[in-house]
Amino acid sequence: MKEDQVVAEEPGFQDEEESLFQDIDLLQKHGINVADIKKLKSVGICTIKGIQMTTRRALCNVKGLSEAKVDKIKEAANKLIEPGFLTAFEYSEKRKMVFHITTGSQEFDKLLGGGIESMAITEAFGEFRTGKTQLSHTLCVTAQLPGAGGYPGGKIIFIDTENTFRPDRLRDIADRFNVDHDAVLDNVLYARAYTSEHQMELLDYVAAKFHEEAGIFKLLIIDSIMALFRVDFSGRGELAERQQKLAQMLSRLQKISEEYNVAVFVTNQMTADPGATMTFQADPKKPIGGHILAHASTTRISLRKGRGELRIAKIYDSPEMPENEATFAITAGGIGDAKE
């Protein structure tokens, strides 16, 4: 496959990827038996880093792993991984692995500092018809194209919670970028999630797939992240449980994005904010998911309608980009620049 060759040509990129995907089978050399390794893989833990990212308590909940075994596994994993501290310079070198996926609009990319970032969760929220699903579909195509900074392009996993995924839309967008329809559709793995639990289970499959084809997958899209939680947990009585389950899922997403160096893009809905009328806010709506989702998302983008097919994206929260706005258009070929 073409992506393999591109990645293989860059020795620096390859070394970094190697150290990123230390296979869990390496534990055999440190006295962990194959049966126990299989148990870890069954819950989506496929790398040494994955063990480091999982608490002892969570590992003890894996069927067939006793506390003594978990201690032994943790000890073996710690021998294989370097200690946790780096200088800021070393970390900045490590950050060079981070890539950006273009949104299809130069203005929008500029707003995001290059596009949708890997090793991070980017959340786009807005009312209906603000371009969230169109952006998801456009990213399915642009993530496959070679991009800036030696980005080789790669495959995508799309988890659909609202039945809004349309392969025909990808064909239209592929035409704009002059890419073969079948090749584009072949590189997108699609799954429909029916409940919030099912959504969580799919993430185990995602982790296994990312590990199996290390370095090939570049993007995970969930459209939309909160829809099923809204249905499965209704009313204030279930809010605490909903937020707890949501926190677990977002933590899993963060780990997947860092462990496999992929970009995670999620869309979110809006809700009326009953407290906003007291403070005379111009727009008394807010994204759902509360503080838990707000803290888990690395970059949050607010989308709103402009004139006609124009939409306005605003940085709502970002660790490095200033609060700013960009105007983009929804075209037949997906997200594009607004024509004056």
Swiss-Prot record:
Amino acids binding dsDNA: R230, R236, R242
Compartment(s) where it occurs, according to its Swiss-Prot or TrEMBL record: Nucleus; Chromosome
Gene Ontology BP, a term: chromosome organization involved in meiotic cell cycle
One GO CC annotation: lateral element
Cited Pfam families: HHH_5, Rad51
Record keywords, A-Z: ATP-binding, Cell cycle, Chromosome, DNA-binding, Meiosis, Nucleotide-binding, Nucleus
InterPro entries: AAA+_ATPase (IPR003593), Dmc1 (IPR011940), DNA_recomb/repair_Rad51_C (IPR013632), DNA_recomb/repair_RecA-like (IPR016467), DNA_repair_Rad51/TF_NusA_a-hlx (IPR010995), P-loop_NTPase (IPR027417), RecA_ATP-bd (IPR020588), RecA_monomer-monomer_interface (IPR020587)
Residues reported in the UniProt entry to bind ATP: G126, E127, F128, R129, T130, G131, K132, T133
The family this protein is said to belong to: Belongs to the RecA family. DMC1 subfamily.
Classification of source organism: Eukaryota, Metazoa, Chordata, Craniata, Vertebrata
Subunit structure, interactors included: Double stacked ring-shaped homooctamer. Interacts with BRCA2. Interacts with the MND1-PSMC3IP heterodimer. Interacts with RAD51AP1; the interaction is direct and stimulates DMC1-mediated homologous recombination.
Gene giving rise to this polypeptide: DMC1
Function: Participates in meiotic recombination, specifically in homologous strand assimilation, which is required for the resolution of meiotic double-strand breaks.
Effect on the protein upon substituting R242A: Abolishes binding to ssDNA or dsDNA
Binding site for ssDNA: R230, F233, R236, R242, R311
GO molecular function term, any single one: ATP-dependent activity, acting on DNA
Highest rank taxon of the organism: Eukaryota
Name the UniProt record assigns to this protein: Meiotic recombination protein DMC1/LIM15 homolog
Classification via SUPFAM superfamilies: P-loop containing nucleoside triphosphate hydrolases (SSF52540), Rad51 N-terminal domain-like (SSF47794)
